[in-house]
Amino acid sequence: MTAAALLQWALASVPEIIVVTGACVLLIVGELVRKGRDDLLLWASVAIVLLAAVATLMLAGEMRPAYAGMFISDRFAVFFKLVFYLATILTFFLSRKYAEIEGIGRSEYYVLLLFALVGMMIMASAIDLLSIYVGLELMVLCTYVLTGFLRKERRSNEAALKYVILGAVSTAIFLYGVSLIYGLTGTTQLDRMAEAVSGGPLDPALLLAVVFIVAGLVFKIGAVPFHMWVPDVYEGAPTTITAFMSVAPKAAGFAVILRVFLNPLVEASNAWIIVAAIAVATMALGSFVALVQDNFKRLLAYSSIAHAGFAIFGVVAGGQDGIASVMLYLLIYTFMNLGIFGAVIMMRNGDFSGEVIEDYAGFAKFHPGLALLMLLYLFSLAGIPPTAGFFAKFYVLVALVERGFVALAVIAVLLSVVSAYFYIRIVMVIYMREPERAFEPALTPLVSATLAFTAAGTIGIGLFPAWFLRLAQQSAFGG
């Protein structure tokens, strides 16, 4: 191996190297920082992510394969990495006051988030099943620990334990599928797997391998029938980690799914039939079960399941438009979901948690401006025009109709109507109920900035959806 080749590999992975190096340095520096200087850890973490973002943008102009065909830096990976950076920085901002209240603002909290970010970055650039596994495990190992970070709370420990056990099972299923693929094709690289379907019928064992890989991946995005961990983990984890897990790891899971599912091997296996069934079941379960939830975080967990189902419809559509619709959906979902979680986090003040929907009764009478922001996020999540959430769903539906999946588009619309009810129910509690007590949100400058930024993103994409769709199309394969 020549020095020039090593240099090319290093250049392709500069953003990952920056975050790993920064996280290691932060881990050491964190032990030297005096208690009460958490701001230093926060801004150092933000600086690391921003530096990685600059490096990523510098790589956006060309395609750089690396590590013997296991890793690539292309526009598709750049798009997803920018979504990860956005979600991570906003999570840092939301964590400042919340971490202080909960007593979790130690350096390892930020370091684990950074290493989870590295795992997601690897997943976005991975073009080999083994490198996908490495990124996947780095991400989930960090989120396992972060889920149980409230060590004195039983539900946090319970959530972490459930997540670890079910996550280990899903990983084993995924690895079994990978081993079958390697045994039957002699490779784990996605592009070389296509050679297995050239000429002749598809081996039934390959179909089984595809099913195992599909099962392992849909667990990571919380899709049916591997959704059972989502409600308990989202409810038990620290709210900032719940917010992070609801957007960033989900986007990373979809990045892998788009790379894997649109491979000729998977397309030849007619796996889209399985994926379509998963999409319908996921959206239906998330929408109907959310109707009876009283806990805000648990409701948002089922909301997350329903949104995952809708995004999977874009995977079923396939093609460049289908890919672009999923990418745009995930970008918009990052803004509106972090926004609504930011509203929940700002309610955490003293002995008031804001995790029960009834806690928001009459909120508009005390804080009309903040209530208006919550209204914006909830309407966007429901897909009500002219918010960004409407266009996220609209472009997925367009991709479905253009590919001839009209029945699936109709099902998606009907289930969206069902899901709109539980969002409007929260709006009614905020605006039409009498307040039970007076409360003051923990509205720090960083939380305020996060709410303002996510609101601007939700409104901005709603006003100029075509521009962001073109960005997603240019970032999609072959764009």
Curated annotation (Swiss-Prot):
Disulfide bonds: none
UniProtKB keywords: Cell inner membrane, Cell membrane, Membrane, NAD, Plasmid, Quinone, Translocase, Transmembrane, Transmembrane helix, Transport, Ubiquinone
Compartment(s): Cell inner membrane
GO cellular component: plasma membrane
Reaction equation(s) it catalyzes: a quinone + NADH + 5 H(+)(in) = a quinol + NAD(+) + 4 H(+)(out)
Chief place where the protein resides: membrane
Membrane-spanning ranges: 9-29, 40-60, 75-95, 110-130, 131-151, 164-184, 206-226, 238-258, 272-292, 299-319, 326-346, 371-391, 404-424, 449-469
Recorded topology in the membrane: Multi-pass membrane protein
UniProt keyword Transmembrane helix present: yes
EC numbers on record: 7.1.1.-
Subunit and partners: NDH-1 is composed of 14 different subunits. Subunits NuoA, H, J, K, L, M, N constitute the membrane sector of the complex.
PANTHER family from the UniProt entry: NADH DEHYDROGENASE
Stated role: NDH-1 shuttles electrons from NADH, via FMN and iron-sulfur (Fe-S) centers, to quinones in the respiratory chain. The immediate electron acceptor for the enzyme in this species is believed to be ubiquinone. Couples the redox reaction to proton translocation (for every two electrons transferred, four hydrogen ions are translocated across the cytoplasmic membrane), and thus conserves the redox energy in a proton gradient.
Similarity-based family: Belongs to the complex I subunit 2 family.
Protein name: NADH-quinone oxidoreductase subunit N 2
Name of the coding gene: nuoN2
